[in-house]
């Protein structure tokens, strides 16, 4: 993490953009609208849990980078993701005057409401920080975590708002953006505490149909490598995530970690 931070710190002359403008994908296209969902007299501020920069406001100037807290990807951060997150929080970052951890952000305004919209892997990385933040907040009900499909456990269990893949039938979009859509729904519905959010989401879950099951065909490593090679011949810049989505859309089965490993092996071997 220290070498990574040093690289970013030396990039002061590189082109910068606001984090919210740099981040692409459906999740961020939904999350960008969160500040528009405030109640009268309320201000909604959007922050990002960035694998490259740590906790930053969505307006922070950042350089393009390749890093993720999701394991098994070509650009996954090395080692323990929680340790990586902790190291980033010690760095002043692109906005040195602002909070660099969730704990520090909560400590600055313990009476505010905090809605954390995080995938399972990002919650694993930020978990110790969130647990420390809980001790700082005036009322634990003002701290809510939306992480669809993540099993509630440990010190954060009662902060988790019930949510799983069934809600995709209600909110639409892709599974990757489901957390953001749930977060936006809670904001637009005026729900600002965990007890109300829990009751509301349990009712929504009870109204949803079961998650569809897909009978995909498993492939051997050589078969998967052949498919990846053909796609990269046609489009060298295609990402592992994109090719995996295409692979699954074609009715084929492969775990994300396995596919990413094969993609990385092939990409490194290509001239």
Predicted regions and their residues:
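Positively charged, polyanion-binding regions of nucleic-acid-associated proteins
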Residues: 217-240, 250, 262-271
């Amino acid at each position: 993490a220290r070498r990574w931070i040093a690289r970013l710190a030396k990039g002061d002359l590189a082109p910068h953009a606001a984090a919210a403008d740099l981040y692409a994908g459906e999740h961020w296209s939904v999350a960008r609208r969160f500040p528009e969902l405030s109640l009268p007299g309320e201000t909604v501020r959007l922050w990002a849990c960035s694998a490259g920069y740590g906790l930053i406001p969505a307006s922070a100037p950042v350089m393009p980078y390749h890093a993720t807290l999701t394991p098994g990807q070509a650009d996954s951060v090395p080692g323990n993701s929680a340790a990586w997150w902790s190291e980033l929080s010690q760095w002043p970052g692109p906005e040195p005057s602002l909070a660099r951890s969730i704990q520090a952000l909560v400590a600055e305004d313990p009476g505010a409401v905090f809605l954390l919209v995080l995938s399972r892997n990002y919650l694993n990385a930020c978990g110790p920080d969130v647990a420390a933040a809980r001790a700082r907040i005036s009322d634990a009900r003002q701290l809510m975590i939306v992480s669809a499909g993540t099993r509630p456990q440990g010190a954060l269990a009662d902060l988790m708002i019930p949510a799983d893949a069934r809600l995709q039938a209600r909110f639409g979009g892709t599974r990757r953006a489901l957390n953001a859509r749930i977060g936006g729904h809670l904001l637009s519905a005026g729900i600002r505490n965990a007890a109300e959010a829990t009751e509301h989401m349990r009712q929504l879950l009870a109204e949803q149909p079961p998650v569809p099951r897909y009978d995909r065909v498993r492939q051997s490593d050589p078969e998967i490598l052949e498919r990846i090679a053909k796609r990269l011949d046609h489009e060298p810049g295609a990402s592992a995530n994109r090719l995996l989505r295409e692979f699954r859309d074609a009715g084929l089965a492969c775990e994300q970690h396995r596919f990413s490993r094969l993609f990385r092996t092939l990409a490194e071997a290509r001239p």
